[in-house]
């Protein structure tokens, strides 16, 4: 297996996270990266996108991708990649797709990075980032899209959960966009709650309800996370600084498309949390809760991949109505156009030389 295309620091990080198994895991990771290169004909992909619950059906609609000029290069079953489990949860696909993606115009002005996106205009924030509706593109970028993911509650080990992330890193990805379906931890209230509007507990949120109403399908940029799963992608003394996993510059680009930002917490699942657990999580300053994403983010960060995330509001944890998986899937499907736009913005940032992978 040729490792010449992998930066030296990343290859060493791969060896480090595989040190407990005598090198077998590393061989599988490198072989998986070779398979991706052979099937796709791409020496190095730039961006990894992982689709969360409910987006599988959209990912099967090729027109949903090609309408914006995306070109599908290849489809690869996850089962063809060594050590990568096939997702069993409803709403998750079992493929990885290779696309050539049009890169949205990204430029640096006096106030920071700006991205032109699709059908959305947002005010410029403190980080100087906005998404605009001009729809201008510059260049094309190779992107890997995983149509689903596996979870701890499927009976898998943490290393199995992150195997695809590690293979993608070995295949060259420098940016990763991780998406998921999350339960909103703001406390609903007011007459709009029954119609699917989440009005936050203003004492906790520090803002007025009128300004901060959440709707099903709203996207939140993940600023930070709390790992309550009791799991780690590492075995042995792999001491990784995770103070700032969620890349500020990538997240700033996303905030022009999805202006909400907050903290995501990962639980093991598969059961949803109790009322007492929900109150405790909210008291910790958590905004959204789910059962994925965090282990992948940690594994990618250790390999020098710049990570950002979007959590789709799929339910309201304080609602008296019971949460069902079917309702979660329905709520997130409408977020696909914004996720697609986010990928194009990240591709644009990558073309402008903002990648900072291990070297």
Predicted regions and their residues:
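Metabolite-binding pocket within alpha/beta catalytic cores that recognizes anionic/polar moieties
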Residues: 2-112, 133-240
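Long, intrinsically disordered low-complexity tandem-repeat segments
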Residues: 110-133
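His/Asp/Glu-rich mid-to-C-terminal helical/loop segments that flank catalytic regions of hydrolases
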Residues: 317-359
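Metal-dependent peptidase/peptidase-like ectodomains
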Residues: 234-267
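Zn-dependent metallopeptidase/amidohydrolase metal-coordination segment
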Residues: 291-328
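Short acidic/polar active-site loop segments enriched in Thr and Asp
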Residues: 174-175, 287, 306
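Non-catalytic positions within long, well-ordered alpha-helices that form the structural scaffold/packing
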Residues: 169-170, 282, 301
